[in-house]
């Protein structure tokens, strides 16, 4: 499946410009796009319904717009549903969501990322790491904290445009690569 990245970029920017710029609206739209992507990829009945030539485009639009009304999603996104159905673009909703999230992070000056530790961290350590990285980047960070014992020690911070790796595993890999090159 080839994704038309330029079309996805245009649609995501169109959504960003039409939706209110508050955190709740942007996160609601992001969740809605994620829901559409999961439904299309993992739910065969939904995919069959959307791709069926026997179901009119109006019925498809009505169904997806009813999902918008049931959720707390801004009404400004309804034009997007029309374009999705008319151009049969539900297959690229995942790419549109990724680009939308990137654009909304820029608007809100927030980085969403993953903070991975080798063992369960102390709250003070997490706060200190986040505070120092926020100071360097001049942006707020909303990390999702997880544990991966394969790191041996240290942590990894993965943001959309940055990976900060202070784990023992990466140090050992770098040392191994240097020894191999000798």
Swiss-Prot record:
Swiss-Prot/TrEMBL keywords: ATP synthesis, Cell inner membrane, Cell membrane, CF(1), Hydrogen ion transport, Ion transport, Membrane, Transport
Single GO cellular component term: plasma membrane
GO terms assigned for molecular function: proton-transporting ATP synthase activity, rotational mechanism
Subcellular location: Cell inner membrane
Superkingdom, natural source: Bacteria
Pfam families linked to this entry: OSCP
Keyword GTP-binding listed: no
UniProt KW Transport keyword: yes
Membrane topology classification: Peripheral membrane protein
Xref: Gene3D superfamilies: N-terminal domain of the delta subunit of the F1F0-ATP synthase
InterPro entries, sorted: ATP_synth_OSCP/delta_N_sf (IPR026015), ATPase_OSCP/dsu (IPR000711)
Subunit structure: F-type ATPases have 2 components, F(1) - the catalytic core - and F(0) - the membrane proton channel. F(1) has five subunits: alpha(3), beta(3), gamma(1), delta(1), epsilon(1). F(0) has three main subunits: a(1), b(2) and c(10-14). The alpha and beta chains form an alternating ring which encloses part of the gamma chain. F(1) is attached to F(0) by a central stalk formed by the gamma and epsilon chains, while a peripheral stalk is formed by the delta and b chains.
Cross-referenced NCBIfam families: ATP_synt_delta
Family to which the UniProt record says this protein belongs: Belongs to the ATPase delta chain family.
Function description: F(1)F(0) ATP synthase produces ATP from ADP in the presence of a proton or sodium gradient. F-type ATPases consist of two structural domains, F(1) containing the extramembraneous catalytic core and F(0) containing the membrane proton channel, linked together by a central stalk and a peripheral stalk. During catalysis, ATP synthesis in the catalytic domain of F(1) is coupled via a rotary mechanism of the central stalk subunits to proton translocation.
Protein name stated in the entry: ATP synthase subunit delta
